[in-house]
Regions:
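A charged, aromatic-enriched C-terminal amphipathic alpha-helix characteristic of glycosyltransferases
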Residues: 18, 76-78, 92-122
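Conserved acidic donor-binding segment of nucleotide-sugar-dependent glycosyltransferases
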Residues: 67-79, 86-93
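Nucleotide-activated donor-binding/catalytic signature segment of Leloir-type glycosyltransferases, i.e.
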Residues: 1-17
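A short alpha->beta transition loop at the rim of the catalytic pocket in nucleotide-sugar-dependent
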Residues: 24, 50-51
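Nucleotide-sugar-dependent
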Residues: 12-19, 26-44, 54-63
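A general structural signal marking secondary-structure boundaries and capping sites
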Residues: 30, 92-93, 125-126
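Short alpha-helix at the nucleotide-sugar/activated-sugar donor binding site of glycosyltransferases
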Residues: 47, 66
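A generic structural signal for alpha->beta connector loops
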Residues: 2-4, 50, 70
């Protein structure tokens, strides 16, 4: 293994929350070309714990991570991912802070926010 990097087997959601809450950053990835429209829920789980994310992949998630200061977005490339890990370990990665990311999740990606967006689409079709 790599010093300072913990790779753990699959655990319950409760246990995963505990690990994410203590992490310096979490890593979520999505292979390009397959599910570019998908939004990895690992990102939201990490941010809900107030932990920044390294997102390696395409799509809206990459845009959100960069634009909102939720962590680092990069391509699915081992060197870019390693650079992001080093940036978090050294304290130089962009990050708006735990409370700001929790507020961003509530405003943009919560069940309430998604429900309001869906309702607006339905209303606009009437």
């Amino acid at each position: 293994g790599v010093a300072g990097v913990d790779l753990i087997p699959a655990v319950s959601a409760h246990e995963a929350d505990r690990w994410m809450a203590r992490a310096t950053a979490t890593l979520a990835s999505l292979r390009p070309g397959g599910y570019d429209y998908a939004y990895p829920t690992k990102i939201l789980a990490s941010l809900a714990q107030g932990t920044p994310v390294i997102y390696a992949g395409p799509g809206q998630a990459a845009h959100d991570v960069v634009e909102a200061g939720l962590g680092v977005a990069c391509s699915l490339d081992v060197d870019e991912i390693a650079e992001a890990m080093v940036a978090f370990a050294s304290g130089s990665a962009p990050w708006v802070g735990a409370e700001a990311v929790r507020a961003w999740v509530r405003k943009h990606r919560s069940v309430e926010a998604s429900s309001c967006s869906a309702a607006m689409v339905v209303r606009s079709a009437l």
